Every structure is written in structure tokens, then in C-alpha cells.
Amino acid sequence: MAQACDAFMAYATVHTWLSSLQRQARLTPQERQECLQVLAAFCAYVRQAPDVIITTCLCDTPDGKTIQSRSRQHYAAQIDAFQQQVSGSLRQQVQYGRIVRSFLIHNGVMLQAGWQYRPHGTSE
């Protein structure tokens, strides 16, 4: 899996995402690898390369890039479906979704928060 993750670094959108995350969160090498593994799993799930996912969601216009609503909705639904098939706890499923959403968000595709994890006994 490490080779597949290293190959993902060749994608401009992955580089943009990880650079932005690193500026915000100072990822450890282990956290960086986990993010790459989750994104690789999602891309395999939807059968699309990272750059294709972002290109599909953004459209060039004379005024700049705009978000394609249908594509954004499609990928939001795909992230929800991807989360559901992750083995493990609800917390892990939510974390996988957050990682994939962060990839889109850091590349200019705004999304809703998606599933939230709240331990039992926690109120709003």
C-alpha cells in the first residue's frame, strides 16, 4: 500500500491537499500515510484518480472556477457510502469521511460536514 500512496503524490491535487494540511495541522509521517491510504481507498472505491475527482467537481469559467453542484452532490453521496463500508467503529468511519472531505475542501470543493461522531452522553 505504501507504493500506491507514494504514487498518489504525483497528482497535483494530492500535493495541494497535503501541503495545505501540513500548514494547518503539522501531520506526523504516520498521519500523512494514513491520509494517503484513506484517499487511495476512496479513489479505488469510486474508480477515479484524485485529479479527475477535483476536475469533475470544478468548472473553468471566465470569472474563475465554479463548483459543479451535481458532481459535488455525487461525491458527497459517494463519501457517505464509502464510510458505511469501512470496517471498524463509527468513529473510524467518520474519520475516513473527514479525511476524504478534507481532500475535496482543500482543493476548492466546499462540502457539508457529513457524519458527526459524538460519544454517548455528549450533548450539543
Where are these regions (language model features)?
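Acidic, low-complexity proline/glycine-rich segments
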Residues: M1-Y11
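N-terminal core-binding DNA-recognition domain of tyrosine recombinases/integrases
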Residues: T16-Q30, L36-S123
